[in-house]
Amino acid sequence: EPKLLIGLTSSSSAEVMKGCAAEAEGLIIPTSFAPITDVAKEVAALANANGGDADLHSAAAWENVMIIKRVIEAVGVTGDPANIEEERLAVRNGLEALETTEGLIGQITRVQDEGEALKPYVFVQAQAGNWTVIHDPR
């Protein structure tokens, strides 16, 4: 029997716990989402209240939508059809200029010349049918 099982990041979802919790027991997975901050807990509760689950995929989608929302507000998009080209360019430039933003579990940094996002992470472990945070490097 293995002493340590490390799982694929995208497996840290509610579906795994619903479908094969016993088989996943003890599995350790690095992930970019767990409800460890007030805002992450709020988003997880909203997802549950609406029949969903918050995981690294849906949390990333939430973060992306909120980033776009903040940029739209910051550049002053009006929605006026006469300004569509200028406003599209302003949003594009606003997104490109972002170097850091607040994510659900901490600050997200962007490597400008690569376009790669550096996100905080935690390690979760499958324990009794739930994902339990076992390492939080904050």
Question: What are the roles of these predicted feature ranges?
Answer:
Residues 1-138:
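Extracytosolic ligand-binding ectodomains
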